[in-house]
Regions:
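Acidic, PIN/NYN-like endoribonuclease modules and their adjacent C-terminal/linker elements
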Residues: 1, 98, 102-130
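Short, well-structured N-terminal submotif of metal-dependent ribonuclease cores
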Residues: 1-38, 47-61, 130
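Generic structural signal for small/hydrophobic residues in well-ordered secondary structure
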Residues: 5-6, 46, 76, 101, ...
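Alpha-helix capping/helix-boundary segments
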Residues: 8, 42, 72, 97, ...
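Nucleotide phosphate-binding site architecture
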Residues: 9-10, 44-47, 117, 125
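Active-site neighborhoods of divalent-metal-dependent phosphate/nucleic-acid chemistry enzymes
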Residues: 19, 65-111
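A general structural signal for well-ordered alpha-helical segments in protein cores
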Residues: 39, 43, 53-56, 73-76, ...
Length: 130
């Protein structure tokens, strides 16, 4: 199981809407037995920027959403404190997405490696090399 970051969803939607088979679609197709999830935070970010509301919600349907729980909040607070102490802050939404992945014990697939690699213990994957 893996969690897909908002950056991945945006690239996947662009490929899908253009009928292209790019890096994001190839990544999903490389192992059909792999399960993919998204954070409710990624759903929020994606839908906020999506033009046709109904279409955006339909686009996200194949990806079960992981909730922000008390456990996620605890992990996020530790991540935030650590990054602030290092002077290496990332956005609060990215912190919540990272905390969701850490709590679930799964890697995150993203195009935003620079931010997520700052989070200790988080396994970060890119789809661009596929």
């Amino acid at each position: 199981m893996k969690i897909l970051d908002t950056s991945f969803l945006i690239f996947l939607q662009r490929e899908w809407s253009r009928g292209e088979t790019g890096a994001a679609r190839r990544y999903l197709a490389q192992d059909e037995s792999e399960e993919f999830r998204i954070s409710v935070i990624s759903a929020l970010e994606f839908l906020e920027g999506y033009r046709q509301t109904g279409d955006g919600e339909r686009f996200l349907e194949p990806f079960p959403q992981l909730e922000v729980t008390e456990g996620v909040a605890r992990i996020a607070s530790r991540i935030r404190r650590t990054l602030r102490q290092r002077g290496a802050m990332i956005g609060d939404f990215d912190i919540l997405i990272a905390a969701t992945a850490l709590l679930a014990g799964i890697p995150i697939v993203t195009d935003n490696i620079r931010h997520f690699e700052r989070v200790d213990g988080l396994v970060v994957e890119t789809y661009r090399s596929i």
